[in-house]
Amino acid sequence: MSSNELFELLYNEINLKNHFWWPNYGTFEVVIGAVLTQNTKWQNVESSLLNLKNKGVLSIEGILSLDDETLANLIKPSGFNNVKTKRLKNLLSAISLEFGDFENFKDSVDKEWLISQKGIGAESCSAILCYACERDEMVVDNYTIKILNFLNYEFESYLEAQEWLCGVDFDMLSKKYDFKSLNELYCAYHGLFVEFGKEHIKGYKFSQYAKNLLENFG
């Protein structure tokens, strides 16, 4: 079994309307969403993002201008709002100091710098690089690991799982599914895992349909 085969299985199961998948791909909003989505559902993140938009503060300067209590209230739907307030403030202060603005951050940030920021783990780092900065970075989330484990793949680290997934044949898949870049492929691949997981995995329980599909595939 190869990463290519798994990609095609998921691609044929999920009707992915947009290869880039993440809402407002390539924008500053993705950075905020990647932090807010830690340990919560995306619909909760959308409520928080809407609060920030309605307040007119969905920017580095806007968020940094807020006191902690105000920001915590605005992002309350995402849960862990006091912790996430500190994480956002720390990250955006560092971005402002090191890069000045989002566009420079998008063009210049590297993985080592980003993952060294407090509260930014491997998954959040990959999500920001892939969906905000448009880099060739594959995101590995819990759904991905659960599916790979079901297929009897065990990985000792995030990087090891990421490397296996990145074994896709871009030339073949780009011709077959019209991917214009490796980033576009990685965006879609992660999106497929998430959408499949949302539909077929509850906790650690797979739907019978998913079990049959993956067992036959494996």
Specify the residue positions occupied by each region the protein language model found.
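Catalytic cores of DNA base-excision repair glycosylases
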Residues: 3-218
